[in-house]
Swiss-Prot record:
Single GO molecular function: structural constituent of ribosome
Biological process according to GO: translation
A GO term from the CC aspect: cytosolic large ribosomal subunit
Pfam families: Ribosomal_L3 (PF00297)
Keywords assigned by UniProt, alphabetized: Methylation, Ribonucleoprotein, Ribosomal protein, RNA-binding, rRNA-binding
Source organism superkingdom: Bacteria
Organism annotation: Cronobacter sakazakii (strain ATCC BAA-894)
ATP-binding is among the record's keywords: no
Protein name in the entry: Large ribosomal subunit protein uL3
Protein family: Belongs to the universal ribosomal protein uL3 family.
Subunit (UniProt): Part of the 50S ribosomal subunit. Forms a cluster with proteins L14 and L19.
Function in brief: One of the primary rRNA binding proteins, it binds directly near the 3'-end of the 23S rRNA, where it nucleates assembly of the 50S subunit.
Record PTM text: Methylated by PrmB.
N5-methylglutamine modification, residue list: Q150
Amino acid sequence: MIGLVGKKVGMTRIFTEEGVSIPVTVIEVEANRVTQVKDLANDGYRAVQVTTGAKKANRVTKPEAGHFAKAGVEAGRGLWEFRLADGEEYTVGQSISVELFAEVKKVDVTGTSKGKGFAGTVKRWNFRTQDATHGNSLSHRVPGSIGQNQTPGKVFKGKKMAGQLGNERVTVQSLDVVRVDAERNLLLVKGAVPGATGSDLIVKPAVKA
């Protein structure tokens, strides 16, 4: 089963009949329009390419305009691709709604996390801070030793150090689907998802469900 592309609206909460509060993220999943269907003969694999939303005409490049025109769909804000399982069939120009998830219990949500800029090891990797007093001079939040010895005489790759934090692709797995509102194109999932309000999200049926 393929996934869909949506937009993060924000977080709220809903109550069950027993009065239990459930924190939910609201994802707006407008109709995903099929722009291309890839097959084994031409592309070496089976996949469906979709777009969603809209883009100003003066923002659409000529190659993009030709691609959308060939598919006979309105230019969207991007292009995304999902691999097709055996037996799944879609046609170019087809519209796929949030009702795709009507029978799905859990989903995986992929997005781009909020960028935090250049961060130190305490914020980025949860390092302990060093002594606040007792002879500590200007080394309260420094990482400490990062090296080895004359052998191997280098810092190993992957060493946790200061650097860019956030603004990377993140997937949160197995979130419960709380509600599917096909009338308003909304999907409510339990818990938080990556990214800022208004950012694009890829929602797929959970691989570990």
